[in-house]
Amino acid sequence: MRFWTSAAAAEILRRDEHVVRKLLNPRVYSKLVNAFSETETKLRSLCEDSNPQLKNAVSVFQQAVDSGSSLAFAGNNLMAKLVRSRNHELAFSFYRKMLETDTFINFVSLSGLLECYVQMRKTGFAFGVLALMLKRGFAFNVYNHNILLKGLCRNLECGKAVSLLREMRRNSLMPDVFSYNTVIRGFCEGKELEKALELANEMKGSGCSWSLVTWGILIDAFCKAGKMDEAMGFLKEMKFMGLEADLVVYTSLIRGFCDCGELDRGKALFDEVLERGDSPCAITYNTLIRGFCKLGQLKEASEIFEFMIERGVRPNVYTYTGLIDGLCGVGKTKEALQLLNLMIEKDEEPNAVTYNIIINKLCKDGLVADAVEIVELMKKRRTRPDNITYNILLGGLCAKGDLDEASKLLYLMLKDSSYTDPDVISYNALIHGLCKENRLHQALDIYDLLVEKLGAGDRVTTNILLNSTLKAGDVNKAMELWKQISDSKIVRNSDTYTAMIDGFCKTGMLNVAKGLLCKMRVSELQPSVFDYNCLLSSLCKEGSLDQAWRLFEEMQRDNNFPDVVSFNIMIDGSLKAGDIKSAESLLVGMSRAGLSPDLFTYSKLINRFLKLGYLDEAISFFDKMVDSGFEPDAHICDSVLKYCISQGETDKLTELVKKLVDKDIVLDKELTCTVMDYMCNSSANMDLAKRLLRVTDDKEERDK
């Protein structure tokens, strides 16, 4: 009996059935055959391609080996079936059962094991299987290596994949076109186009010709990288070699031109496809429609849509979604809703992306109630709203100031299983809304809830709260949040430092702000001009002009060039300190830096010179301001003209009024009356006074 149930008996029966038949009498032979045939017949039935029941087959196999049967052939066959069905976890588990029962494992099963390890992203173990094959005397083939190459590339280990290719050649196992295409695609997906092209040329040199797939991989990759000249060069080379690019290649090129905004060239390729007699598929049409919509060319997109229907190509969910997105992008929300209804009428079910586009537009338009109706429609049609849906709604409610409803929605997401669980973006939306409305205490409560549920927020969370706590003057809470960032895995970015520097400057804690700026400078993060300007402004306000100058000079040494705001801060600080010489040198430095004074610069200079009694200098800057195209505001005009009146400078007043009238610059009513009254009571030019009045009257007429 032991002989009948041994692994050896099973193998002998398989390989040498005629020998066994001669050695055993008919009764014994019949018993031996029946011992295996019943189980194996059942296994074959369970593994039939038409209706595979592989889990049941594994159970039957396990029961058979538990009862002492050896089913090596059936086991290896089942292993192959499991791998072919892509049920890799079950296949791996089954392989271990085969090992435990001492079942003979053949080459096919080891090949399947190799594929399992690759699918499980364990390429190191897959290499071990190759070694095991070699140890057992099996000659592994190109197919095994191709599986391994695919695994390496999927793990972004393309360098190892190239080494394996070369090792194959050294072992006289020539890589085939699939081998090369796998690694070329890996390099392309990793955006290493030069290496992909280098390997493709090496492929040619090894005597392995490029297939249409090779051309397609390269063209698609160069299109995605926006290198359209190179991609078109490949197409030209294909044509020169007598190869005909397929629709996939043309679609890649059309998409590339659409992504680059070159719709004309994309449309020309589309027309070329039609001229060749090919029928573009929905993907090709969708690519072109999306391209036109992206540039707001809805008329052209609609024409392609109509042409698509005329040609008998059924628009799919992506077609409608692209058009709906385009309509929403140009503010045509009503038309987008009509298209959504048409889509449903045509039995093309919208997906979550389709609904989210419309919900987002409605929320941006402030129509949150309408957006909620779309969410209800979504549920009614059995499309489950996702996190993006609810996050859009949360943002819409917060933007509208309906924070109580936003809070209710967040708690529903937490408690109701029909809703998705909130993510960090959900919490951030509500925290930001509460902070904007100065409800910091509630925002901090939501933050505590976030930490309880998710463990920690992200940089956006901390930046919002740091800004708000410092704005509210709650320095202790801000420092507590800063410490939490330090203790957590959240990486502080420049926005985090900016929030702290700005906040501490506004609360007058300049030493802390300076310390943060220094810390930022020695880290990998480069302080922005805004960071420097915050400190410069605060130092000037507290009268620390010397420190401000040192920081201004350090800023330039660090290649963080001052902007107009930086110069304005320093000019204003210098003028307030009575240092006119420094203010003038700053104006020169501003010009050398290629910057022009703005309205703020001129305002500060004019007002400061007037306070110092330097009317000529003030008028000089007033003239420069007007000549530069800036329209002086009411405050500047009031200051300069009233100063002229107070000093009895009739001629200078007349010159200024003439310049303003010539430029059609209108004074406010009160100042016009003051100037008119002065001009009437002095020897001023009355024609000019009338012109000033006419300009004011004309402005009033235009405003009616």
Curated annotation (Swiss-Prot):
A Pfam family annotated for this UniProt entry: PPR_1
InterPro entries: Pentatricopeptide_rpt, TPR-like_helical_dom_sf
PPR repeats: 71-105, 106-140, 141-175, 176-210, 211-245, 246-280, 281-315, 316-350, 351-385, 386-416, 423-453, 458-492, 493-527, 528-562, 563-597, 598-632, 633-667
GO cellular component: mitochondrion
Keywords in alphabetical order: Repeat
GO BP: mitochondrial mRNA 5'-end processing
Protein name per Swiss-Prot or TrEMBL: Pentatricopeptide repeat-containing protein At4g28010
Protein family according to the UniProt entry: Belongs to the PPR family. P subfamily.
Record-linked Gene3D superfamilies: Tetratricopeptide repeat domain (1.25.40.10)
